[in-house]
């Protein structure tokens, strides 16, 4: 009887600690910096003053990547490539097992999505609106000067601004102010 009570007590303690331990697990998905040309600054979050980025550094939720004039960077998240052009600021607002949310503050990114699952999980925001990818393809997003331009090389996307939402197919482009 005493052994049973002790066992129940230990199980109750473990049940209390298990949810906390599960929450502490890092996400299974991270990005990797795979190409760096020129000075690129990496900040782990908005409070981080930043450091020079290095190849193969992991990118997690909250990370901010800034490219200097004449620099570029490439980040892979599983089978998806995100290429940053010169003078670009990109924040990974969400990067977990279910979603990748990119916030492009300025500059240009090219996004290559290789499968439907990746396309459904990734979306991008700019100061002017949101871009949702409808399927695999190659996309370019440029933002600055109060305007965002979205070009679809292959695939299709939906671009949503303040007062409209438009589909953009392969070989097409859309602008939002």
Can you annotate each of these PLM segments?
Residues 8-17:
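Bacterial N-terminal signal peptides
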Residues 22-176:
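Flexible, surface-exposed loop/linker segments and immediately adjacent secondary-structure boundaries
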Residues 1-9:
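Bacterial N-terminal signal peptides that target proteins for export
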């Amino acid at each position: 009887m005493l052994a049973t009570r002790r066992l129940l007590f230990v199980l109750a303690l473990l049940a209390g600690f298990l949810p906390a331990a599960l929450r502490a697990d890092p996400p299974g998905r991270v990005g990797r910096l795979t190409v760096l040309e020129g000075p690129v600054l990496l900040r782990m979050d908005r409070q981080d003053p930043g450091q020079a980025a290095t190849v193969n550094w992991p990118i997690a939720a909250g990370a901010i990547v800034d490219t200097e004039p004449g620099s570029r960077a490439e980040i892979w998240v599983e089978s998806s490539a995100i290429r940053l052009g010169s003078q670009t600021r990109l924040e990974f607002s969400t990067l977990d097992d279910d979603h990748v949310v990119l916030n492009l503050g300025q500059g240009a990114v090219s996004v290559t999505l290789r499968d439907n699952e990746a396309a459904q999980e990734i979306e991008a925001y700019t100061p002017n609106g949101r871009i949702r990818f409808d399927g695999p393809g190659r996309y370019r997003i440029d933002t600055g000067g109060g305007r965002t331009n979205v070009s679809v090389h292959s695939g299709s996307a939906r671009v949503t601004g303040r007062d409209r939402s438009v589909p953009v197919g392969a070989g097409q482009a859309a602008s939002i102010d």
